[in-house]
Amino acid sequence: MSQATSMRKRHRFNSRMTRIVLLISFIFFFGRFIYSSVGAWQHHQSKKEAQQSTLSVESPVQR
């Protein structure tokens, strides 16, 4: 009986550790997603501004 009880405790500990590891992994994944989203948005904005500035410079030449 004591062996079955220790197996149950070990199983509970293993499932708890698995949940903790998965939670930490999810937090890292979510943090990296937010970080890359902010970087991509800033890159998109700077590219958009650069394109608008080149269009405004080229517009008088075409006339």
Curated annotation (Swiss-Prot):
The transmembrane residues are 20-40
This protein's record includes keyword Nucleus = no
Q: Which GO terms describe its cellular component?
A: plasma membrane
**Where is this protein chiefly located?**
membrane
Q: Where in the cell is it found?
A: Cell inner membrane
InterPro entries attached here?
Answer: YfgG
Protein name in UniProt: Protein YfgG
